[in-house]
Amino acid sequence: MRNSDNYGEITRKAKVKHGIWTGVKYFFLALWAIIVLFPFYWMVLTSLKDYGAYNSEYIPKFFTLYPTLANYAEAFTAVPLARYFMNTLLFTVVTTALMLIVITLAAFAFARLEFRGKRIAFTLLLSLMMIPNELVIITNFVTITDWGLRNTFTGLILPSVTSVFYIYLLKENFAQVPDELYYASKVDGASDMAYLTRVLIPICSPTLVTVIILKVIECWNSYVWPRLITDDSRYFLVSGGIQAIREGGFGRDNIPAMMAAVVAISVPLIALFLIFRKKIMEGVSRGGLKG
């Protein structure tokens, strides 16, 4: 009987301890979620406030009783934001497609093919990750300028069609596929390209989807390179367009409309991430596993 009482007491204390720890954990998680989400909430809230109401707030309010969508209409009419969207869409689609071809072929060569200097070449490729991005931008800018490709989509796209990190990620994923599949395809008379397209790519599709999504996000958020290589508004992306809005005085005078433009630009990426977040995590974990 005594042992039973002791066991019950131990169980009760364990449950209390577990409950306290769970409560503390969820408290800090909730606090962290608020810290992370508050800037986006404030951005959306500001975009829904009337211009006059916003300027009359000496003390900022955390809600609005009279939300309005007029700021969104003004954001698209005050500047050619729709054109910036189309430019960004074109830049993102073409860059992602070309990069996917380049990194897939490069990753396949390093993962499966045998050629002289393969290890040295791969080591040199990885060493490029150690070079500061600022130095690469300077080199790319001089090269694109010498080729006469400033203020062109070609100049925007060319420096972004490859990525050492994505080649490494995809190469590690390709290397996990059993060698027996490669030898079996060779016995069946398949070429290396047939093995790549019919076997490797379907098996490694989660990683490829991850790379595509991450590249789309990267292209959509590009600012430094597009801003550096283009000064013609016909080639502005949404990021450069927002800066043009602000420099033109519109953003300084009408913060709610400025926030409406930022929300409109952010929503596609947020939706993309929320829809494919499981694919992203699955692809990254697959690329980082050995065996």
PLM features per residue range, with description:
Residues 2-17, 21-291:
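A structural signal for multi-pass alpha-helical bundles of membrane permease subunits
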